[in-house]
Amino acid sequence: MNYYMNNGSSNAEENNKELNNEIKAVYESLEKRKDGTTRQTISNAIIVLENDPEFKGAIKRNELSCQTDIVKKMDWRRRSKSFTDTDFNNILLRMEKRYGITRDKNVKRAVDIVSNNNHYHPIIEKLEGLEWDGVVRVRHLLPKYLGTEESDYIY
């Protein structure tokens, strides 16, 4: 049974040919059984999470909170960035409809692997996004606040 062709598209997706082509390409890249059904493997679930246009780049591990976050806007109602059971159930539903992947244990493991490979730290990202204004401040920090003499040794 070809899950993509029979179950894979909602009406909105059918109107979007490019999205359908991307989903079809992901479906065709999955490992199949002799009867044409999708194999229920962790590696297939990882392929979907890393390549499906909806999931690609969405699942990341937050190194500050040590939790999995969804950092993209998704098609279902969400209350926070933190990964919830509702998020998992929606991902599983889409994997089942589009790709025939139904084994929730393997999808859970794939989410963990993908989020670990795509980690981020929100504070570091914020700091790396800032530009220095060119004003030297550190050189005068110790003399100003600790009363040390200004010299090249404490710069």
Pin down the residues of each PLM region.
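N-terminal nucleic-acid engagement/recognition segments and initiation subdomains in replication
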Residues: M1-V136, E150-Y153
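Long, mid-chain structured domain cores
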Residues: G134-Y145
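Conserved NTP-binding/hydrolysis core of motor NTPases
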Residues: P143-Y155
